[in-house]
């Protein structure tokens, strides 16, 4: 089963979910707010996704963090712990398909992912 991780009111997540529905793709949505990803899950994502991609330093959640919290994210372990505690700083959506992980949404990427 394809899983989409994110926050329901995020515009990018909405676009991804709409695209999947319009293309008849069955998927399960995992809401970060109701079911935050565990350290193990985030670590698994990082096996395929670079930390700089997964950790969203452009969002308001990141900017609201104090310097100490931001500094803790300089290490992989610190970043994983921070993402588990503050899932809003994870770039969204995270798509899981057949053991592969993808971050963000663009129609072109989704067309390529689902043409295989």
Regions found by a protein language model. Give the residues of each.
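Local sequence-structure signature of Cys/Sec-based thiol-disulfide redox active-site neighborhoods
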Residues: 1-23, 28-32
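Thiol/selenol-based redox catalytic cores and closely related redox-interacting motifs
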Residues: 32-116
